[in-house]
Amino acid sequence: MAGVEEASSFGGHLNRDLDPDDREEGTSSTAEEAAKKKRRKKKKGKGAVSAGQQELDKESGTSVDEVAKQLERQALEEKEKDDDDEDGDGDGDGAAGKKKKKKKKKRGPRVQTDPPSVPICDLYPNGVFPKGQECEYPPTQDGRTAAWRTTSEEKKALDQASEEIWNDFREAAEAHRQVRKYVMSWIKPGMTMIEICEKLEDCSRKLIKENGLNAGLAFPTGCSLNNCAAHYTPNAGDTTVLQYDDICKIDFGTHISGRIIDCAFTVTFNPKYDILLKAVKDATNTGIKCAGIDVRLCDVGEAIQEVMESYEVEIDGKTYQVKPIRNLNGHSIGPYRIHAGKTVPIVKGGEATRMEEGEVYAIETFGSTGKGVVHDDMECSHYMKNFDVGHVPIRLPRTKHLLNVINENFGTLAFCRRWLDRLGESKYLMALKNLCDLGIVDPYPPLCDIKGSYTAQFEHTILLRPTCKEVVSRGDDY
């Protein structure tokens, strides 16, 4: 439209310019000359309009080209958007989609840092965590195989119904695996036991994404040395230093929603203990292999003892038969309950009770060069609220306050004095003793064999799922 108006204006100017020229051609104007002039003007006016039209056509052509290019760009962007949707990398339209895609690409899938600091739940944003080692159940006493469980539709449905529970265990187990791998990269002689425990626990809290009673540490880090087999963690002021000739049992736990992973291993620097570690690891794996639905607990203990006692170890020129520590054992695990009632012996005898479908067990074995029996020794550091205790009236305000702190932060999970210190508690020893005397809290002092002996431990958590047995804490290390 603008092009047409421009052409008309241009024609008017031509008329004004031509009038003087026409008048100069003659003084008298005849009708014929006037007609000629009129035709000439009309012709030139047409030419001007034609020129304007050409310009309009040119502009229209340019607009068409631009529109075509724009459509082409839009089609290309839509194609890119479709590709992004297929890859799950973007959900915007056109340029916005491209921008989103770039942003996501830049961020990428999260990977673990060194040292580990990214929570396990962030590494697996879909909420599905790595499974442990899945094993077929052992044959029954009459020789029948348990392979049918893996294909049974009923058992598959039951297994799927508890998937959320199994998944909580797997998240806690993955945190345990990554923490212990990290610990093995830096633990060395010369470090204090407090330094080792605090560094381990700090990492564990990050990976499990500690959140009150919903996620966190299941019990204090055990770092029992030499003849001490279990339940030692340093209290404030403990100056014990890890030595080259020490044999250290690292036993720590993680939990998600009270689903506890109880898993332990032994650290040594002197190769003279290698056979002792091999014996205990073999015994633990034997216990795991024998465990299963309808298996008697005493049969598991008998198999463990047989394997462990088949080993002899020479330390400093003296030969010892490796003995299982008879008054230590594995145990069933319940929600927020590390010892849920059933015990898995590591020697012949014990309960004839059977393992049941859906149960969770900590299979742990302890080997010793001493008597193979432990007793309470040293200062107590581990405590745990009694799971079955009812309401007990408390008079002392300090004791009441401490119980509230325990209920809010630990519930029925085990804790240690260092953790009370960390919460800002002070002068609590009398209140803690009072809670123990009332039976509300149980103390768990360090358990030791005779002085001069050496003890080792390995432990895994297993899930007795309807379809198979899952060694959920299994890793590449053990």
UniProtKB/Swiss-Prot annotation:
Its EC number is 3.4.11.18. Residues 1-123 are annotated as: Disordered. One of its GO terms (biological process) is protein processing. It is an enzyme of class 3 (hydrolase). The gene is Metap2. This is Methionine aminopeptidase 2. Cotranslationally removes the N-terminal methionine from nascent proteins. The N-terminal methionine is often cleaved when the second residue in the primary sequence is small and uncharged (Met-Ala-, Cys, Gly, Pro, Ser, Thr, or Val). Residues 55-79 have a biased composition (Basic and acidic residues). It comes from Rattus norvegicus (Rat). O-glycosylated; contains 12 O-linked GlcNAc. Residues 80-92 have a biased composition (Acidic residues). Induction: Heat shock increases expression by more than 36-fold. Glycans are attached at residues 60, 63.
